[in-house]
Amino acid sequence: MTNTQQQSESIDDNQAQLSKQQNSDNNKKVPRVLMILDGFGHREDDKDNAIAAADMPNLDKIYEQYPHGLISASGEDVGLPDGQFGNSEVGHMNLGAGRVLYQDSTRISSEVASRDFYKNEALVNAVKAANTLGGNVHIMGLLSDGGVHSNQDHIEAMCHSALVHGAKNVFVHCFLDGRDTPPKSADKYINRLRDHIIKLNAHYESGRVQIASIIGRYYAMDRDNRWDRVQKAYELITEGKADRLSTRADGAVQAAYKARETDEFINPTVVIGRDEVPYTVDDNDALIFMNFRADRARELAQAFVLPDHEFSGFARNKQPKLAAFVMLTKYSDVLADNPKTSIAYYPTSLTNTLGEYLQSKGKTQLRIAETEKYAHVTFFFSGGREDEYKGETRILVPSPDVATYDLQPEMSAPEVTDKLVEAIESGQYDVLVVNYANGDMVGHTGIFDAAVQAVEALDVCVGRVAAAVHAAGGDMLITADHGNCEQMQDYESGQVHTQHTTEHVPLIYVGEKKVQVRSGGKLSDVAPTILALMDIEAPKEMTGENLLVAAE
């Protein structure tokens, strides 16, 4: 073979390889990324504002270069009562549904007001089942007016309903908040419940209500498989195993404060009555879980109802044979299918959420988050659906194993970003939905410096993702599900601010389209906007509207 022939064949090989690469690139999908910065609200005042205090070169550049605006993420705009701050469940459901969703909390409160709550079949039957077997009624849930996981009005109504339907003994196991409420505010809620109980006991001579235990939500409401925490709550409620004994719930709270525990972290405490024995859940008792939000109720619920071959969280010394176990709402398919459980309020069915509609159009989608927010970009974003859609891929990145996230403010954001950038570059996905948990999870600690570090870690990740989207010729929307870390001090209580806010959240378009962000938007407008970026008409079920309009 001559040199000329060899050169010719080499050129042909290179051209063939280049052609193959071009064909491969042509087959790559144009990525549309929805980036949800959890707990990242907009607040004009820079004081005690972790976002304003952070060094954010990437986000600052994005704000300078791309269209942006603000959208509503709280109150009636997301299906909550007027003035109620948003939360991650509500936010992600509105983001994925493309319509305002009236929340379980609103629905249940409406039934309490109309007294239909007192006729709820699952709740009434649970009380009657315990009565028939000579058992007691136990009510457990987050005692708070935070409105994120529970509502104290519902717990008080359940105490009343149990007596109305003939319960002899009603015991309340209180999970204390300090996360969606000020860190040391439990006295307010305990005293309110105590006053309600006094009135009920005075009116219904045939039955009585009593607070049986208190414990911080850190233990009772884990969602990250920290079973050692859940075990403490389970053993408190079933065995009376506690760090403290008290004759009064308010006294127990004060004892915890003296031990430098805030509400969220209050150790297991038994509140004993005149007979000086714990009031525990036993055989033939009914147990009613009054949290309406699923993600932080599942683990404890599983401990009460799953058989040994399905439950591996911890060894259960006592497994009461319950007369009934009621979930206020559907916590999971597994729990709903369990013959020992019933559901007071079933979810309303949703059709043509963003995920379902993308499936119907033959599109591919990725959902990615670390453990703390994985349920939000999957279950909640899909309108309460557990299963993947056809063409959907899910990536779960483990959250760091630390006691509180101020100890590792970056959490697993860098690892989430690694996998997200890889997915964008792969060209396999039409739509990629990512949640970054830092702003919310570190914001909840109330530690300002850690929240600033969390935002700065996010900024690095945002820059990397924006570069990948640009290189792939795609589009990205950056938004949030609710506010949090933009306010780290509570000026009313004088304590650190650990709960969410009612602030608007950013909506930033990153891409090459000549558009601007219209005013008056809300979270339910995001899904139709994603579809508009793909030149796909939104389904009729999506009442939200495109947030992007032609630039003037």
Curated annotation (Swiss-Prot):
Catalyzes the interconversion of 2-phosphoglycerate and 3-phosphoglycerate. Keywords: Glycolysis, Isomerase, Manganese, Metal-binding. Mn(2+) 2 binds at residues 38, 88, 481-482. Its cofactor is Mn(2+). Binds 2 manganese ions per subunit. It catalyses: (2R)-2-phosphoglycerate = (2R)-3-phosphoglycerate. Monomer. One of its GO terms (biological process) is glycolytic process. CDD domains: iPGM (cd16010). GO terms for molecular function: manganese ion binding; phosphoglycerate mutase activity. The keyword Metal-binding applies. GO terms for cellular component: cytosol. Residues 1-30 are annotated as: Disordered. InterPro entries: Alkaline_phosphatase_core_sf, BPG-indep_PGM_N, Metalloenzyme, PGAM_B_sf, Pgm_bpd_ind. Residues 1-25 have a biased composition (Polar residues). Belongs to the BPG-independent phosphoglycerate mutase family. This is 2,3-bisphosphoglycerate-independent phosphoglycerate mutase. Its EC number is 5.4.2.12. Pathway: Carbohydrate degradation; glycolysis; pyruvate from D-glyceraldehyde 3-phosphate: step 3/5. Mn(2+) 1 binds at residues 440, 444, 500. The active site is at 88 (phosphoserine intermediate). HAMAP family: GpmI. It comes from the Bacteria. The keyword Metal-binding applies. Substrate binds at residues 149, 179-180, 217, 223, 293-296, 373.
